[in-house]
């Protein structure tokens, strides 16, 4: 601006969208299990359709292969229609671990012998799937060495609060994989 005052600004913006065009791995039985046609590092998970409400609900649902289930456990959709919920029912979901958009902006100010520069940056359209101890504050077992977050303890499915749409599934006494699967829940 003048000999004593200097101001400058800067910014950046990048956009990146990718898709796997070729993969020499053998094709999967179901097209949605293949990497070709999807972005690199595409997250895959099970589609949650709520929580089991009763033993009758469990008996009338496809078999889940991630351990025995009880009322209050996450209920998953049978994508391939074979009556069994397993790794073949995982579908692409969400953004990948590679951001589509990166951005930044900054400003520099100098007045006499005083200098100040600030830069801000960010990324968006990026995803991460979390589960297990990242959600519950422990491995989900009430016998583990960790503690549950208060949020989980107060908003989970219980026999006294049998809400099939509870924010969190039931808690369990020991290692249990069904409720820790990567999913839309």
Per-region residue spans from a language model:
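Short Gly/aromatic-enriched secondary-structure transition segments
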Residues: 121-124, 129-136
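Short, intrinsically disordered, charge-balanced linker/junction segments flanking boundaries
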Residues: 175-185
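Conserved small-residue
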Residues: 2-97, 135-137, 144-177
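Transmembrane beta-strands of outer-membrane beta-barrel proteins
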Residues: 7-11, 105, 111, 116-118
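Generic recognition of flexible, low-complexity loop/linker segments
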Residues: 92-93, 103-106
């Amino acid at each position: 601006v003048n000999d004593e005052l200097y101001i400058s600004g800067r910014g950046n913006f990048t956009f990146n969208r990718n898709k796997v065009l070729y993969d020499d791995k053998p094709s999967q039985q179901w097209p949605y299990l293949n990497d070709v046609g999807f972005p690199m590092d595409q997250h895959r998970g099970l589609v949650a359709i709520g929580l089991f409400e009763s033993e009758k609900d469990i008996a009338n649902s496809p078999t889940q292969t991630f351990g025995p289930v009880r009322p209050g456990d996450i209920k998953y959709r049978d994508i391939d229609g074979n009556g069994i919920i397993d790794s073949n029912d995982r579908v692409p979901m969400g953004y990948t671990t590679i951001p589509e958009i990166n951005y930044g902006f900054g400003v520099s100010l100098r007045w006499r012998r005083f200098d100040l520069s600030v830069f801000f940056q960010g990324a968006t359209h990026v995803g991460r799937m979390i589960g297990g101890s990242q959600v519950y504050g422990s491995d989900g077992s009430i016998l583990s060495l960790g503690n549950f977050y208060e949020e989980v303890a107060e908003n989970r499915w219980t026999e006294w609060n049998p809400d099939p749409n509870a924010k969190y599934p039931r808690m369990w006494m020991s290692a249990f994989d069904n409720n820790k699967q990567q999913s839309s829940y």
